[in-house]
C-alpha cells in the first residue's frame, strides 16, 4: 500500500516536471530575442549608454521602446542587429540571443544577422535609384538575378508595404521622387524584400505628417502577422495604438517592461507613471 502511494506521488512529480518543461519550451519558442545583462559604453568606456539590460522580445509582436531622449532605447535597438559595431570606441558586455544563437559571438557572421533582421530609420532613406532597383537591391546582393524572380519579389514587397497600387506604373521613377510617406513605405518594402524575421524601426513616423503616419501604423499592424517588430517611439499614443509590449527605458536601464495596456493603465513604478503623465522627460 505504501509502495503504491509512493509510486503515485513519484508519477505526479514526473508529470509536473514534464508540464513545467513543456511550458518553458513554449515560452522559449515564442521569444525571438533574449537579452541578458547587456551593457554598452561609448568612447572606449567613458560614457555608459546601457546598464545591465535584460529583456525578452516576443515573436510576432510589436514591441515599443519608450523613454526620454538619450535614455538608451535607440542604442538598444541598434544592438539587436549589431549596428553599434560600426561605431569606433564602442564596448559591450552581456549576451543577445536571436532565435537561440548568441549574436555577440564572433563565430556568428554579421551577414547572417543582417539578412534576418531588417532596419527602418527615422528619416526615409531611399537609394537615388529607381523604385524597382531600391527593392531589388537586397535580393540581388543575396545572389538573386533572375528577372522573373526579382519582378515577383518587387511586386510582393510593394504590396506588403501597401505601395504597389500607387507606384506599379512608375517603377522606373527614382525612389527619391516619392512623397515622404511613400518613401518610408518604400524603405519598409526594401527591408522586407530579403524576407527577414524581424523589423527594427527607429522612430519611423517622426518625420511624417499625420496622414502618412496613420498609413505606416496601419501597415505595421498588418506586418506583425509575418514579422516580429521592435519600434522606438517618442509618441505615447502611438505606442498604445500599435504595440503589444512596451519597454520603458530611463538613464540606460529598463525601468519597467510589460504588456502595453498594463504599462499605460496600471504602471507598477512611480517613475513609469511620472513619465507617462509627462512629469519627467
UniProtKB/Swiss-Prot annotation:
SMART domains: AAA. Residues 33-276 form the ABC transporter domain. Its main location: membrane. It comes from the Bacteria. GO terms for molecular function: ATP binding; ATP hydrolysis activity; ATPase-coupled phosphate ion transmembrane transporter activity. It is a peripheral membrane protein. It is an enzyme of class 7 (translocase). GO terms for biological process: phosphate ion transmembrane transport. It is found in: Cell membrane. ATP binds at residues 67-74. Its EC number is 7.3.2.1. GO terms for cellular component: plasma membrane. Keywords: ATP-binding, Cell membrane, Membrane, Nucleotide-binding, Phosphate transport, Translocase, Transport. It catalyses: phosphate(out) + ATP + H2O = ADP + 2 phosphate(in) + H(+). Part of the ABC transporter complex PstSACB involved in phosphate import. Responsible for energy coupling to the transport system. NCBIfam families: 3a0107s01c2. Belongs to the ABC transporter superfamily. Phosphate importer (TC 3.A.1.7) family. The complex is composed of two ATP-binding proteins (PstB), two transmembrane proteins (PstC and PstA) and a solute-binding protein (PstS). This is Phosphate import ATP-binding protein PstB. It comes from Mycoplasma mobile (strain ATCC 43663 / 163K / NCTC 11711) (Mesomycoplasma mobile).
Amino acid at each position: 500500500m505504501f509502495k503504491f502511494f509512493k509510486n503515485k506521488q513519484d508519477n505526479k512529480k514526473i508529470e509536473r516536471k514534464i508540464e513545467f518543461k513543456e511550458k518553458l519550451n513554449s515560452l522559449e519558442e515564442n521569444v525571438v530575442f533574449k537579452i541578458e545583462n547587456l551593457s554598452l559604453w561609448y568612447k572606449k568606456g567613458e560614457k555608459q549608454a546601457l546598464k545591465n539590460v535584460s529583456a525578452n522580445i516576443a515573436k510576432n509582436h510589436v514591441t515599443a521602446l519608450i523613454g526620454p531622449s538619450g535614455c538608451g532605447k535607440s542604442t538598444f535597438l541598434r544592438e539587436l542587429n549589431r549596428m553599434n559595431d560600426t561605431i569606433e570606441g564602442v564596448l559591450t558586455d552581456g549576451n543577445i540571443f536571436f532565435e537561440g544563437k548568441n549574436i555577440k559571438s564572433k563565430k556568428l557572421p554579421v551577414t547572417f544577422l543582417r539578412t534576418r533582421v531588417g532596419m527602418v530609420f527615422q528619416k526615409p532613406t531611399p537609394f537615388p535609384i529607381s523604385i524597382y532597383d531600391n527593392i531589388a537591391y537586397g535580393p540581388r546582393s543575396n545572389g538573386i538575378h533572375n528577372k522573373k524572380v526579382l519582378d515577383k519579389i518587387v511586386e510582393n514587397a510593394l504590396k506588403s508595404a501597401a505601395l504597389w497600387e500607387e507606384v506599379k506604373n512608375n517603377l522606373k521613377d527614382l525612389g527619391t521622387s516619392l512623397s515622404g510617406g511613400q518613401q518610408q513605405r518604400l524603405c519598409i518594402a526594401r527591408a522586407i524584400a530579403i524576407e527577414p524575421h524581424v523589423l527594427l524601426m527607429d522612430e519611423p513616423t517622426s518625420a511624417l505628417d499625420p496622414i502618412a503616419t496613420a498609413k505606416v501604423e496601419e501597415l505595421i499592424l498588418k506586418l506583425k502577422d509575418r514579422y516580429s517588430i521592435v519600434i522606438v517611439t517618442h509618441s505615447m499614443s502611438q505606442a498604445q495604438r500599435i504595440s503589444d509590449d512596451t519597454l520603458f527605458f530611463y538613464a540606460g536601464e529598463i525601468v519597467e517592461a510589460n504588456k502595453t495596456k498594463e504599462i499605460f493603465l496600471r504602471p507598477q513604478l512611480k517613475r513609469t507613471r511620472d513619465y507617462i503623465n509627462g512629469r519627467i522627460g
